Each structure stands twice: as structure tokens, then as C-alpha cells.
Amino acid sequence: MASLAALLPLLALLVLCRLDPAQAFVNQHLCGSHLVEALYLVCGERGFFYTPKSRREVEELQVGQAELGGGPGAGGLQPSALELALQKRGIVEQCCTSICSLYQLENYCN
């Protein structure tokens, strides 16, 4: 758990630059420890909900995707829009693979 002392330099930088914290996090790639620190900063005392997928779950998802189509131009079955919409988008997909905003991070706060 990140201590308040570890977050103080970041908070001081925000104050010195006179940036609104919401503007400081708009459209950022956040991965690994940077993602966790951003969640601590955004959620504060509320804490956050994060359950990373196990390696087995990730491998099963990759196998399932390969069986559906095997990638672009492979000629296999392509997933329907409904199947894509039903896939769970986690915080890693939202903030590390893609970019996310402060408001998307707040969705993971308790």
C-alpha cells in the first residue's frame, strides 16, 4: 500500500504547477505501479476494487479468440458485435492498453 509520504511529491508537483488534478490525469496510459498509484490518488480513503485476471484466465481468453477467428484476415468466424460488447473490459484494458481518464479511474473506487 502506497503511503501518504510517497504521494506527497506528486501532490506538491500538482500544486506547484497549479494543475487541476482532473486535467493532470486526462487521457493517460497507466500501467503497473503507475496505475495502482493513480488509483490510490484518485480514490483516497475510499479505496479501490481491483482483481487482476489470473494467467490461466488470460490464456483461456486468447485461445477463445484464436478459435473465433485467428486474427484479421484469417478467414475464421468473426465475433459478433454482441459478443464483443459482452466481453468484460477491465482497468488494464482501459488504462494500460488504451488510454483512460480520471473519470474512468473513479469507476474502480469503492
Curated annotation (Swiss-Prot):
Disulfide bonds join C31-C96, C43-C109, C95-C100. Insulin decreases blood glucose concentration. It increases cell permeability to monosaccharides, amino acids and fatty acids. It accelerates glycolysis, the pentose phosphate cycle, and glycogen synthesis in liver. One of its GO terms (cellular component) is extracellular space. The keyword Signal applies. The gene is INS. Heterodimer of a B chain and an A chain linked by two disulfide bonds. Residues 57-87 form a propeptide. SUPFAM superfamilies: Insulin-like. Coiled coil: none annotated. The keyword NADP does not apply. It is found in: Secreted. GO terms for biological process: cellular response to oxygen-containing compound; glucose homeostasis; glucose metabolic process; positive regulation of protein secretion. Keywords: Carbohydrate metabolism, Cleavage on pair of basic residues, Disulfide bond, Glucose metabolism, Hormone, Secreted, Signal. InterPro entries: Insulin, Insulin-like, Insulin-like_sf, Insulin_CS, Insulin_family. Belongs to the insulin family. Residues 1-24 form the signal peptide. GO terms for molecular function: hormone activity; insulin receptor binding. This is Insulin.
